Amino acid sequence: MRYIKSITQQKLSFLLAIYIGLFMNGAVFYRRFGSYAHDFTVWKGISAVVELAATVLVTFFLLRLLSLFGRRSWRILASLVVLFSAGASYYMTFLNVVIGYGIIASVMTTDIDLSKEVVGLNFILWLIAVSALPLILIWNNRCRYTLLRQLRTPGQRIRSLAVVVLAGIMVWAPIRLLDIQQKKVERATGVDLPSYGGIVANSYLPSNWLSALGLYAWARVDESSDNNSLLNPAKKFTYQAPQNVDDTYVVFIIGETTRWDHMGIFGYERNTTPKLAQEKNLAAFRGYSCDTATKLSLRCMFVRQGGAEDNPQRTLKEQNIFAVLKQLGFSSDLYAMQSEMWFYSNTMADNIAYREQIGAEPRNRGKPVDDMLLVDEMQQSLGRNPDGKHLIILHTKGSHFNYTQRYPRSFAQWKPECIGVDSGCTKAQMINSYDNSVTYVDHFISSVIDQVRDKKAIVFYAADHGESINEREHLHGTPRELAPPEQFRVPMMVWMSDKYLENPANAQAFAQLKKEADMKVPRRHVELYDTIMGCLGYTSPDGGINENNNWCHIPQAKEAAAN
């Protein structure tokens, strides 16, 4: 204990760097380098050494920089680095989660209910066990010779600063050289690979969560500008409404984590969508999301193509389709089982109610707070707007982990299930629970359709992102450059009521939808804006609708008009 108290802050930083950089990243090293023994090359050996050294040196560099704030502040900040890294290491070790912007955005969401569902007893025990030793070192050390103290002391400035700068160079230079080597391989093979430095930064603690946290903070500042700073398509372009839109109801269901390759209507071996399979007025597409986390997808899936930056945080540049419809005369209500208030306010909805508000309603007391409560809210909304030209947005929990909590016991069709986050579930158990949740999604969508079956209505559905459910990877939120394909697989659907199809133009558009669905034409999130406008019958003479993205666009129409 006397030694712990007496060592300098620089030595303590190095010891902590070894602990965080090597021990907490142990599972990542094993996965990245495990295959090297069977296919070893000199460059692979060099890269392994470089990455091992980089994780230690970058942590040392960070801890020394933090000591510029003084001894007391350093203790607090270093403790946070340890705790955050220990927490992240749990998911990296046991769930093989890549800690990127999507994960940080999900953790920092105001929707605590969903976030806490992936925190169990095992996580807490791991956090305590892994962080105890470094926290003891931090709080029992005198923290002598912080970088701030050394810079103020003549004779120590150059040497102390040189050590920090050298650590930074020793991280950057080897990684840069390996990046250059990789570029040469890319040119020789014609294979496009992600940046080597970017892969390393996203793979290891603490650089992965620190860089993601920095992006999240920047995005929050970026989002603080209101809708007036965003391009407004309703003002930039001319939108001509069809004659028969004033009595139309539009419903958009935002799904959560549901994958099309686990839905029976797309050929999945289990009949997870028995009710949707009976809908004759439904066109269902194999879709691909614009990102892998809710907060990111909500930024890019409802704007025109290019309406969100192609950067990690998906900076918004334009107003979304719901805000445009509001400005075109639609009344609108938004009901959510989540709490993405930044997005909800951007829709310009007349009425917004999220989970806590809905659950507090007297009619909902004692009821489980799940997606079916949104159907009750929808009924109330329809009753208040009997004349149509009304938009209802429903943001669901869908198939979000913990899957078993997404559906009532009566939908537990496939067993055994994955009961809890700490239960050590097998892949089969997780799939059983996931498929049960998809069946409940089927029930929910069908229930929504039932509310407008006798009205002139169109219902859209699109999940925000997919999910990884296998031995190597779980959950979602992986940076999209690194994400596996299943995190992008989302079902996208359009349903039109019989009354809506009484209009010949709408019937023709639906026939086009069915034709493309039968041909298994893949669809994308970035096509939703133009599709919603197009399927409602809006036209734009000055480019407000990209017909290439409009699923309801009939290619022969132009030829017929020309003749």
PLM regions: where:
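Transmembrane and membrane-interface helices of multi-pass
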Residues: 1-196
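Catalytic cores of PAPS-dependent sulfotransferases
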Residues: 65-75, 95, 324-334, 347, ...
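Extracellular glycan-modifying ectodomains
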Residues: 86-88, 157, 176, 361, ...
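Active-site-proximal alpha/beta segments of enzymes that process anionic O-linked groups
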Residues: 174-419, 489, 524-558
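A long, amphipathic alpha-helix that forms part
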Residues: 238, 376-380, 417-461, 488, ...
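Active-site-flanking alpha-helical
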Residues: 263, 449, 471
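Histidine-centered active-site microenvironments of extracellular/periplasmic hydrolases
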Residues: 267-271, 457, 462-505, 545
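A short beta-strand-to-alpha-helix junction
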Residues: 312-319, 428-440, 480-489, 501-532, ...
